[in-house]
């Protein structure tokens, strides 16, 4: 350590006052040597009561032999203030490199913070740029300021004039300079306010560009005993350079050579950059840094040299250990320590063991940080890999999306052209299909109308002749009674009337301009119908004889099984129909398979739905495809003859292709909101039902059992696809009921007296035929039991037909017990499955009570016959047949009575 007496070193920077422990250090009367522009003067210890202020201008003047300026403070406070003031931007202080600095002789040893050559070299070796720091009064380093000093404001300069008056011992060598500085002093309060304002404005300014040689950042107020106002006043003159016409601030001496200063500053910057590069290279070579703080007995200094702490500093809170050096512009930690006076303790001067510990500790810290950095690098690498993978996936997805978009565009363009072509195609072919459909409908209507007209003409021929004959016979019988002679007379009258009517019905010869008889064809048709009637009568007689011999209800009677169709009409109808179907097969023959084949069209739309379902849905294709597929279905349904063929839709090609249209490929069922599931039902409703409706209304022969059976099958088929709420289906049911009502109204069953049947020829055959026709109609009505409601059937078959027209005929022939029993059996057989038979309960057979009463009437007739002594095999056979009728009607009690009455050996 050096001498213990207080040393006064020249200071540079915003340091505090010069009072240390109550003592005031004053400058010596004369300097010991002349320093360069970058080195401060050293003070002698011979004048303890005076202090010399150092400025760059003073130093230059000293080099040139100019007299120096001394300050004579009046009191301790003034001396403290004057020792801490700096020159403003007009000062020529510069930070030069170490080589340019000339050594100055000093009467003291280099202390901590001094500008000795050894200290600066050690500082350059171990320390990078250090932040701004404030040293204590004990250290008092010599600092060279550079940069511009913000000039004080005019009002501040005016207020500083009062300070000049308080400084009475200022002695400048040049009177002009003394007068200039006397005007630059201000009062203390104004200086404090200006200092606070500038410190607030310069907080964002960069750190000082000089190297502090203090022993660390020290709280000068606590160490030196400087007041808060003095501490706030320190560093007030740091700021931008004032303008040329501005007045100089406190201690602001004129700068007569600014260009030289700027050149020096630029060289300083270059030297600093070179020193920084050298320092960085040296640090990389060393591999480890120097610790600036070690343990509780060392503190961090601005020059990288550890300074021991005073014993009274041990009570301060322990600061976090800093790294080896502070970067330029980075503020130092707020560590307040008091450096000791004496030579600095360098890391290199420590024992080897301590240096090894420091190096080991630094190495461990570096390894720890390296591991942390490695972990962060690995984490960053992992995230980078993840991001790269995600990016690659995104790129792949985008490429796939782009390729899919391209495929979609191509597909949509082709599909647009396809739909455009197929719409035009269907518009052209649709007229041909409609023409063939109209011709097919016309053919069916003609075929049905020919049968109906022939039946009506035949009935009219018979009824006209029989009507006249019956009327003549009834006239004779009503006048003369029922004797055999009267019956013979009635027969003669009937024949005469019949012959007369036949002659009137014969068409006379009517020649046209070419000599052809226009009525010849009509007469031939009448003759053909008469011959057909004769054949039917002959068949009836044969069946009646067989019924007398055969004991059973299975034998049908005349009129019950006749279809009223001629072989010639049937063959002509089939020939014309086949030619129309051949024309239909050639409708699409001139088109390519892409448009003419339903399977190709279906596959095209199914691919659209499968690959681009959203666009398929947005285009409302579920509402459009029925219209597109409809021509193909209509063309195939031309072959569908629902009245003459019992064909299921499953046997048709269009149904097999469109039944699973739009169904998922995985075999799952349709989605609830997929309207393509209703494609086939919609086609059935819009295409098939209209065809069937036309056949029912215009072509159905209700008396034909075969056509009725096929019509029932076709109606049942369409009801399986279409809901009951369908309007088309409701219209179909209404048409069926209307046709049945019309048929019941058109039929008539004669109720002639038995005497008339005996007297008038052919009346029994006609009555039997009409009865057989009514039974046939009743049986055809009962075929609709699974389609029409039971009350509707009951009203049609029972109320209107059975009770209104059939039973009166049976009652009229009751005296002819054989015919009456036979016809009753046919009635019960026609109602089987609906109101009669083993599968029907008694509840359903109750509406047949009139038929039961008629059967009981026949039983009483047989009982009378048995009571008259006619107990023959015929009577027993009729009784047995009545018993079976009652069993079918669920009248078992009456059946048992017949068994007991006629001694039948049969169980009921």
Swiss-Prot record:
Annotated Basic and acidic residues bias: 513-530
InterPro entries with a match to the protein in the record: GCFC2-like, GCFC_dom
Gene Ontology MF terms in the entry: DNA binding; translation repressor activity
Residue span of region Disordered: 1-113, 238-277, 513-574
Keyword Transcription regulation tagged: yes
Chain coiled-coil ranges: 426-453
Keywords: Coiled coil, Nucleus, Repressor, Transcription, Transcription regulation
Main location: nucleus
GO biological process per UniProt: DNA endoreduplication; mRNA splicing, via spliceosome; negative regulation of DNA-templated transcription
Entry similarity comment: Belongs to the GCF family.
Function: Transcriptional repressor regulating endoreduplication through control of A-type cyclins expression. Does not bind to promoter sequences (in vitro) and may act by interacting with tissue-specific transcription factors. Enhances the endocycle in endoreduplicating cells in seedlings. Required for efficient splicing.
The name this protein goes by in its record: Transcriptional repressor ILP1
Native species: Arabidopsis thaliana
Gene responsible for this protein: ILP1
